[in-house]
Amino acid sequence: SHPVNLGLTGGFQTGCRYALEHGYDAVIQFDADGQHMPQYVMPMVERMEQDGADIVIGSRFVDVEKPVSARMIGSRLITSIIKLTCGKTINDPTSGMRLFNHKMVAEFVRRFDFGPEPDSVAFLMRKGAKVSEVQVQMRERQAGESYLNAWKSISYMARTCMSILFVQWF
C-alpha cells in the first residue's frame, strides 16, 4: 500500500519489487477495469516458454485485423514507429495485458520511472528483449471510468511516439 496514488508506473514497480523479493519467475500486468480475462494467462506463459520470450503481449490483433477507427489511428502509429525503430511488428502495442519474465521484472525495478508502456517495451526490444504476442479477446470495461478523453488520448499517443523516436534511445 502506498500513502498516495503513485499511478501505473509506481504500482507496477511495487508489484515487480515484491515479485523479485519473493522469487517469482514472471509478472503479468492486467488493467484494473475488468477487460482482461484470466483464461489467457496460461497461453501467455506457454508462449513465453515456447518462444523463449522476455515479454508476451495479450493482443487483440494477432489473428484479427484492427478496426478502422479514430481510436486505432494512434495504435497504428505506435505500431509503425516500433517497426521502424525496432524492426519488429507489435500488433497491439497499447494492450495493458503483458507478461514479463524475471529478467524484465528486474529491469523495471532497476530503472526509475520506467513503466509498462509501449515506449518501455520498445526500449527493451532495442536492448535485445524478445517479444511475442498471443491472440486474446477483451471485454468491454467492467468497472471504473477511463481517465482518457480525446485530448488525453492524443497527448498520450504523442508522448509515446516522441519517447520511442527520441527519448528511449538514451
Regions found by a protein language model. Give the residues of each.
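Active-site-adjacent helix/loop segment of glycosyltransferases
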Residues: 170
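Structural signal for conserved beta-strand scaffold positions within catalytic alpha/beta enzyme cores
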Residues: 1, 57, 133-135
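Acceptor/aglycone-binding surface of glycosyltransferases and processive sugar-polymer synthases
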Residues: 3-4, 8-21, 26, 38-114, ...
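Cys/His-dense Zn2+-coordinating finger/ribbon modules
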Residues: 32
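Glycine/small-residue-rich loop that forms an oxyanion/phosphate-binding "nest" at active or ligand-binding sites
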Residues: 35
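Catalytic donor-sugar/metal-binding loop of nucleotide-sugar-dependent glycosyltransferases
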Residues: 89, 111-112, 122-139
